[in-house]
Amino acid sequence: MRALHFGAGNIGRGFIARVLLKSDFNLIFSDVDQNIINAINNYKKYKIKLIDNSFEKIININNISAINSYDPNVLNVISHVDLITTAAGVNALYKIASILIEGIILRINLKCKKPLNIIACENKIKATSFLKKIIFDKIPLKYHDYFDEYIGFVDCTIDTIVPTFSSFKEENSLFVIAENFKEWIVDVNQFKGMVPKIIDMTLSDNLTSFIDRKILTLNTGHAIAAYLGLMKNYKNICEAMSDFSIQRIVKDAMYESGLVLIKRYNFNKKDHLSYIDKIFVRFKNPFILDKLERIARNPLQKLSKDERLIQPFVEAMKYNLPYFNLVKGIAAALHYRNINDIQSIKLSSLIKEEGLEETLVKVCKLNANSNEIRIIISEYHSIIKDFL
């Protein structure tokens, strides 16, 4: 089978390509960075260093090619492939949507009746459905029936860490370091035609529960570790997780959010606690020096109502579950300052100009004078003296 992947960055090279090539796909990368395109087409291979807490190993990625996303020939590629994946960033989906429309219309003109499945592996809940909406808002009505019959828009959740790596050697320009752990869960009901056989891909008929499990465990713990670590001037996740006080808060916060998930989805408690332990061990991986500023960026998004911090805290209060450590993470996020992060600057200005309560109303969509706001404000002031 043939696959086209948009986004030749770390996730594309370190995760998606690894899985698809292992599953015997013929893979073509597409990207707007001509330097990466040239490197892929010149070398046609690269190495991935897989790392775990106790080992590391090198694997080879071979027989790859690439095409610039602005090259008109990409439409011909779209007209012939069986699978399209993306890991290019949410904002890139608007441009990708336009390219896909042209390529799929070419399939229609070629009278292609072969199903095409599209999976957007982006940092957004149900990113593929988001991409589908962009496409359907743009395409003429006369094409809707073809899209409905032959084009599958498959939502997914992915979980792996591929930290940023820079190399000054030309022969290593495609080299990536990737976590050995990987999880790719897709909605089995959204495929068109036969479901492709992809090694290490989990098929689910209840994707929402897996999405929430990841957001309210991995993302919650990751964010809290970052915001607490930055309060103590740590640089990367490994440094932060070497601090016992941060370890305790992060682990207990994931336990608190876990109780919310168990209540919501009736998860098996023993299994979910085992999942938390697995995530916690990954955070302490000494080989992954993921920068805290990267993890903490975009605090306005991370503090929004349905995101990793506010959602479990509000629901824990609703069900009379513990939230002591979750609120510490929220308070630490509100203290986050980074002059290179536009959202951090906006958050800081909002707190300074309109006060903390109004900020929580506007950013987190909490009700004014609510118990949630009262508890967060109290922790915001106490965490400085209690934690540092």
Swiss-Prot record:
Give the keywords, sorted. Answer: NAD, Oxidoreductase
Give the catalytic activity.
Answer: D-mannitol 1-phosphate + NAD(+) = beta-D-fructose 6-phosphate + NADH + H(+)
Top-level EC class: oxidoreductase
Disulfide links within the chain: none
Give the enzyme's EC designation: 1.1.1.17
Q: Which InterPro entries match?
A: 6-PGluconate_DH-like_C_sf, 6PGD_dom2, Mannitol_1_phos_5_DH, Mannitol_DH, Mannitol_DH_C, Mannitol_DH_N, NAD(P)-bd_dom_sf
GO molecular function ontology, one term from the record: mannitol-1-phosphate 5-dehydrogenase activity
Query: What cellular component terms from Gene Ontology apply here?
Result: cytosol
- Locate the residues binding NAD(+): 3-14
The processes (GO biological process) annotated in the record are: mannitol catabolic process
The protein's matches in PANTHER family, at most eight in alphabetical order, are given as: ALTRONATE OXIDOREDUCTASE-RELATED (PTHR30524:SF0), MANNITOL-1-PHOSPHATE 5-DEHYDROGENASE (PTHR30524)
Protein family = Belongs to the mannitol dehydrogenase family.
Q: Which NCBIfam families match?
A: PRK02318.1-2 (NF002646), PRK02318.2-2 (NF002650), PRK02318.2-5 (NF002652)
UniProt name for this protein: Mannitol-1-phosphate 5-dehydrogenase
